Curated annotation (Swiss-Prot):
Protein name stated in the entry: Small ribosomal subunit protein bS21C
Coiled coil start-end: none
The keyword Ribosomal protein appears for this protein: yes
Region Disordered: start-end pairs: 38-66
One term of GO molecular function: structural constituent of ribosome
Length: 66
């Protein structure tokens, strides 16, 4: 859990923004999204393979020169 020091001299909005940024950096939001539903290991591999294929196709399109 990210921790921040709240300075009483600064507005609360700045501290809240810093906390949100720290949570984003720690990956808490992504972790919650991932744990919302259970995904079987085979499904994880299938998703990863599909992402790798699409990434390779994108790289091939980008590197193709006329």
């Amino acid at each position: 859990m990210p921790r921040i020091i709240v300075d009483p001299k600064k507005p609360f909005d700045i501290s809240l923004r810093n906390f949100k940024r720290a949570c984003e950096k720690a990956g808490i939001k992504q972790e919650l999204r991932d744990r919302q539903h259970y995904v079987k290991p085979t499904q994880k591999r299938k998703i990863a393979k599909k992402a790798a294929i699409s990434k390779a196709k994108k790289e091939a399109r980008r590197s193709y020169s006329y």
